[in-house]
Regions:
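Short beta-strand immediately N-terminal to the catalytic nucleophile in serine-hydrolase-like folds
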Residues: 68, 86-88, 113
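Residue in the alpha/beta-hydrolase core beta-strand immediately N-terminal to the catalytic nucleophile
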Residues: 49, 85, 108-111
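Gly/Ala-rich beta-loop-alpha elbow adjacent to hydrolase catalytic centers
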Residues: 88-92, 96
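Conserved HGGG/HGGXW glycine-rich cap/lid loop of the alpha/beta-hydrolase fold
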Residues: 7-61, 75
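Flexible "cap/lid" loop of the alpha/beta hydrolase fold
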Residues: 97-102, 106-138
C-alpha cells in the first residue's frame, strides 16, 4: 500500500485492477472501509481522507461539497484514474452524487451506504449544534458529540457485544480536529 499526501489530503492506494475509490462520512476516515478490503482484493482501492478529516492536514479555506468534489477529481488526475467505481458512506454519498453530476465520465458506478441527497432540516439544525459545540469546547466538545453519536448510531446490543465497533467509532470521531469538524458540519 502506498500513502500519498496530495495538497494536504491523505490518500491510500492499494492493489491492482479496476479502480474503486472510497469516500467516508462525517467524522470518518479511510479506515471506515477497512472491513471491505478483503472483498476488494482484486481491485485497486483508493481510500481518501477528505480535506480536514482524519490524516489529511488541516484544511485551509472553506470546506464544502464542491471542494470535496474538486479534491476527488484532483486525486484521480494525480493517480491517473480516468474512470472508477465509487463507494460512499453518509456525507460521502452526497459528495459522490455531486461528483457524478460534475464529472460523469469519471464514474463507472456508485455504491452508496446511508445515502442522502441533502440533510433534512432537523439534521441541519443538529449539525449546526455539533459545529458550535466542537468549535467552542474543542476536545471536550468532540467527546460529548462522540458519546451522543455512539448512543444514537449503535444499538445497545452492539455497544455491549461489540466493543471493537464502539472503539472504532470513538477513535474515528475523536481523531477529528474540532475546528475542521465544525466547518464540515456547516
Amino acid at each position: 500500500m502506498a500513502l500519498h499526501l496530495f495538497e494536504r489530503v491523505a490518500v491510500e492506494d492499494e492493489g491492482e485492477g479496476e479502480a474503486v475509490v472510497c469516500v467516508h462520512g462525517l467524522g470518518g476516515s479511510s479506515n471506515s472501509f477497512t472491513p471491505l478490503m478483503p472483498a476488494l482484493a482484486r481491485q485497486r482501492v483508493i481510500r481518501i481522507d477528505l480535506p480536514g478529516s482524519a490524516r489529511s492536514q488541516r484544511a485551509e479555506g472553506p470546506i464544502s461539497i464542491a471542494r470535496f468534489v474538486d479534491t476527488l477529481q484532483s486525486v484521480c488526475a494525480r493517480l491517473n484514474i480516468a474512470r472508477a467505481h465509487w463507494v460512499g458512506h453518509s456525507l460521502g454519498t452526497i459528495v459522490l452524487q455531486n461528483l457524478a453530476v460534475a464529472a460523469p465520465k469519471l464514474v463507472r458506478s456508485l455504491a452508496l451506504f446511508g445515502p442522502l441527497i441533502t440533510p433534512p432540516d432537523p439534521a441541519r439544525t443538529a449539525l449546526r449544534s455539533r459545529a458550535a459545540k466542537a468549535r467552542s469546547e474543542g476536545l471536550a466538545g468532540m467527546h460529548e458529540i462522540t458519546q451522543a453519536l455512539l448512543n444514537a448510531a449503535l444499538s445497545a446490543d452492539t455497544r455491549q457485544r461489540q466493543p471493537l465497533a464502539v472503539a472504532f467509532v470513538r477513535e474515528s470521531l475523536m481523531r477529528q480536529e474540532p475546528e475542521c469538524y465544525a466547518r464540515t458540519c456547516e
